[in-house]
Amino acid sequence: MDLNNKIFNILLPIVTVSFLLVFMPFSIFFKLLQFIRGCKESEKVNGKVVIITGSSSGIGEHLAYEYARRGAYLTLVARREDRLQVVADRCRKLGSPDVAVVRGDVSVIKDCKRFVQETISRFGRLDHLVNNAGIAEAKFFEDYSEISDVLPIVNTNFWGPVYATHFAIPHLKKTKGKIIAVASPAGWSGVPRMSIYAASKAAMINFYETLRIELHPEVGVTIVFPGLIENGNTNPDLLAEKQDWSQVVTIESAAECAKAVVNGICRGKTFVAEPSWVRVLFWLSAICPELLISKPKRN
């Protein structure tokens, strides 16, 4: 190890801790001011146009209802068109002036291009792109008999949002709009039996962190970290996993989560953790990852 690295190894931790001790009070005060300002100057989405992927159930469905209550025009995207029609009907009753339903798979490039184009053709603009579509599977990595079986998870959770974002950016720049990425605390720290899901969400988080810098100030980026949410998933392995976690934390309804998320988006937050205690997992994984390590049980 050369002398420069030795010096950095000694000095940087000391300087960093000292800086944080001085900076943190100012940071907390600044965030408090931002919160107060956000409450007073919350974005009004009445008359704005919003695309929501994965909106046939779970958080995506209730995000659609929340935007509808606030008077937004909606494009709902998912693979189950029959369910989308049901959600769309309720959105109209809740106050959305018009709702477009587009059957599509976000892991398919041409589908992403199509639902963005159809939105512009119908509404003439785009203000919010909500990348919510995602899939999960509770499985030990070594239990995959075919490694290609992991591709649907990665393609939907990471590449899907990337594709949709690529086609949406030119339109979002015109309206100074926002990109919303529904990620997961699993992207911060490892979750046993969900290695591929966690990796796809970690990639998603880092992509949008970088994109926020590249697009600032023309387009805003909000990354969402939902906790344990009741989303109607019927996968038995995922239900068992959720049941294990529910012994430790409370499962929040998708409706409550969606309301908090849209509030955060409209206040211009860069991150929305719901419930808010979820952000503690980030600090634990960064400062003391040993606390999050436990031997997973095999069924």
Swiss-Prot record:
Chain positions recorded as substrate binding sites: 184
Enzyme Commission number, as recorded: 1.1.1.-
GO cellular component, one term: membrane
Topological relation to the membrane, as annotated: Single-pass type II membrane protein
CDD domains associated with the record: 11beta-HSD1_like_SDR_c (cd05332)
Enzyme class: oxidoreductase
Keywords: Lipid biosynthesis, Lipid metabolism, Membrane, NADP, Oxidoreductase, Signal-anchor, Steroid biosynthesis, Transmembrane, Transmembrane helix
Transmembrane segments: 10-30
PROSITE patterns recorded: ADH_SHORT
Active site residues per record: 197
Name the UniProt record assigns to this protein: 11-beta-hydroxysteroid dehydrogenase-like 4A
Species in which this protein is naturally found: Arabidopsis thaliana
Gene name of the encoded protein: HSD4
